[in-house]
Curated annotation (Swiss-Prot):
Name assigned to this protein: Zinc finger and SCAN domain-containing protein 31
GO biological process: regulation of transcription by RNA polymerase II
PROSITE patterns xref list: SCAN_BOX (PS50804), ZINC_FINGER_C2H2_1 (PS00028), ZINC_FINGER_C2H2_2 (PS50157)
Residues in SCAN box domain copies: 39-121
Localization: Nucleus
Family: Belongs to the krueppel C2H2-type zinc-finger protein family.
GO cellular component terms given for this protein: nucleus
Task of the protein: May function as a transcription factor. May be involved in the development of multiple embryonic organs.
ZnF start-end (C2H2-type): 239-261, 267-289, 295-317, 323-345, 351-373, 379-401
Record has Zinc as a keyword: yes
Length: 406
């Protein structure tokens, strides 16, 4: 009986002989690209694609074997693959996409990619032009949120993992708050784009424990309610940051903003030592340890630990799509979906196959294309059992049995 590796090679040959595939299927790359394709097929395998549970389990075993290749990998190498995958999983979504594009082959390589990004965004020479300062500052703070205080004992490992899982879920695009607004900018570099949904916000007003000198206290007392209302109505921004020139309508927001430049994080979690520049961020972070989910959807009962998570979830019920494409008018539920859609107009193809070099606008296109190299054909004809890599090819084939003209 042929070994699994031989079966894998035979499967590739079969795909290459299939007339459906074009000439790109004859290109073979390094092991990592094929390994990544097998990993994705294993992780995204659907139960509905098999006749029953026994077939599903058998198919999962086969896909897992193709991914981990125990016949050629040691136990340590297999463990490293699993740890690497989990590390990428706990990263915030947009940062995860950025790291995956670098195709790290180990956990250390993945960490190096994240650290390089942190360093580049923290260097003054890599900041955006003056009109983009506000967004670049937020990005810098976002990267700082990814740093976890190192502890020598294994006891601290689980809280940190839980914390990173939570932050990957609750961080999102920095929106208008307390008189400060960040304008949309479609010209941001890709390194900034990947982090644009990672700023942590809450419903409640920000509460600060700020040590203010006597001069500032006197100034606050002299500010009348009418002056504040006038500033809000006219959009006047009287409080200017001396570091980057960004202006704010409220002095309290300016003080908080200045922590981006100073790196001050006065609010520290007593559980894991993670520090934050905002008290509200600390309060929401604590829920990663307690498991508390106070924000519940009235429609379906689903609960969330962060208010912004509930806000985005509600759009599923209301049908709200606040992010609209300025070119064609198509609207989207999430800003990340809008960014991906806009590549259709710009022609940008950021998802590239490591096997043959072919590029795609969307990640879904790349995932489907990977089946060319792995030989995966998950769609089976119920009439003749012929297999296909695409659902559209299966539907086209089924017309042969129905007599319908293709």
């Amino acid at each position: 009986m042929a070994s699994t590796e031989e079966q894998y090679d035979l499967k590739i040959v079969k795909v290459e002989e299939d007339p459906i595939w074009d000439q790109e299927t004859h290109l073979r790359g390094n092991n990592f690209s094929g390994q990544e394709a097998s990993r994705q097929l294993f992780r995204q395998f659907c139960y509905q694609e098999t006749p029953g549970p026994r077939e599903a389990l058998s198919r999962l075993r086969e896909l897992c074997h193709q991914w981990l290749r125990p016949e050629i990998h040691t136990k340590e190498q297999i463990l490293e693959l699993l740890v690497l995958e989990q590390f990428l999983t706990i990263l915030p979504e947009e940062l995860q996409a950025w790291v995956r594009e670098h195709h790290p082959e180990s956990g250390e390589e993945a960490v190096a990619v994240v650290e390089d990004l942190e360093q580049e965004l923290s260097e003054p020479g890599n900041q955006a032009p003056d009109h983009e300062h506000g967004h670049s500052e937020v990005l810098l703070e976002d990267v700082e949120h990814l740093k976890v205080k190192q502890e020598p004992t294994d006891i601290q490992l689980q809280p940190m993992v839980t914390q990173l899982r939570y932050e990957s879920f609750c961080l999102h695009q920095f929106q208008e708050q307390d008189g400060e607004s960040i304008p949309e900018n479609q010209e941001l570099a890709s390194k900034q784009e990947i982090l644009k949904e990672m700023e942590h916000l809450g419903d409640s007003k920000l509460q600060r424990d700020v040590s203010l000198d006597s001069k500032y206290r006197e100034t606050c007392k002299r500010d009348s309610k009418a002056e504040k209302q006038q500033a809000h109505s006219t959009g006047e921004r009287r409080h200017r940051c001396n570091e980057c020139g960004k202006s704010f309508t409220k002095s309290s927001v300016l003080i908080e903003h200045q922590r981006i430049h100073t790196g001050e994080k006065p609010y520290e979690c007593e559980e894991c030592g993670k520090a934050f520049s905002r008290r509200s961020s600390l309060n929401e972070h604590r829920r990663s340890h307690t498991g508390e989910k106070p924000y519940q959807c009235k429609e379906c009962g689903k609960a969330f630990s962060a208010s912004n998570g509930l806000t985005r979830h509600r759009r599923i019920h209301t049908g709200e799509k606040p992010y609209e494409c300025k070119v064609c008018g198509k609207a989207f539920l999430l800003s990340s979906c809008l960014v991906q859609h806009q590549r259709i107009h710009t022609g940008e193809k950021r998802y590239q196959c490591r096997e043959c070099g072919k590029a795609f606008i969307q990640n879904a296109g790349l995932f489907q294309h990977l089946r060319v190299h792995t030989g995966e054909k998950p769609y089976q004809c119920s009439q003749c059992s012929k297999l296909f890599s695409k659902r559209t090819l299966l539907k086209k084939h089924q017309k042969i049995h129905t007599g319908e003209r293709p």
